[in-house]
Structures are given as C-alpha cells and as structure tokens.
Amino acid sequence: MDTLRTEEIAAKALKRVHNDRYLLASLIFERVKELGEGAKPLVDMDVKTYKLPDIAMREIAEGKVELTSIEDRE
C-alpha cells in the first residue's frame, strides 16, 4: 500500500464522484455497512488495523468501488 496522506486520498475519492461530497459520504456510508457485514476489503488494508471509513475511502479513491456497484444491490 502506498503512503498517500489522508487529504490526498480524500481528494482522489472526491474526484471520482465529480466533487460531490454528499455523494461521496453516501458511498462511504454504504461501503462501510458492507464491510461491517463482513465484505472483504478491495484494497490491501486490514480491517483490524484501519477504520472502515478509511478503507472505504481508499477503495473509492482507487476506483475499486463506484456508485453503480452500490446502486445495483438495491
């Protein structure tokens, strides 16, 4: 895992959702629920070491989770 600062990760994640911070918050919330229910992280981060929102934001920043993947499950 590279060592991006939290601000850099947040900026990349925000860019992925067209700078819509409300959409980003929703996407993080939905992904945190999935991770909390036992979904495996899509990035190399241990759920026992890192907070679930940090993992979710990293996944979004790296393009591993997109809005359509959450919408399809509803």
From Swiss-Prot:
This is DNA-directed RNA polymerase subunit omega. Promotes RNA polymerase assembly. Latches the N- and C-terminal regions of the beta' subunit thereby facilitating its interaction with the beta and alpha subunits. The gene is rpoZ. InterPro entries: DNA-dir_RNA_pol_omega (IPR003716), Pol_omega/Rpo6/RPB6 (IPR006110), RPB6/omega-like_sf (IPR036161). Belongs to the RNA polymerase subunit omega family. The RNAP catalytic core consists of 2 alpha, 1 beta/beta' and 1 omega subunit. When a sigma factor is associated with the core the holoenzyme is formed, which can initiate transcription. Keywords: DNA-directed RNA polymerase, Nucleotidyltransferase, Transcription, Transferase. It comes from the Bacteria. It is an enzyme of class 2 (transferase). Coiled coil: none annotated.
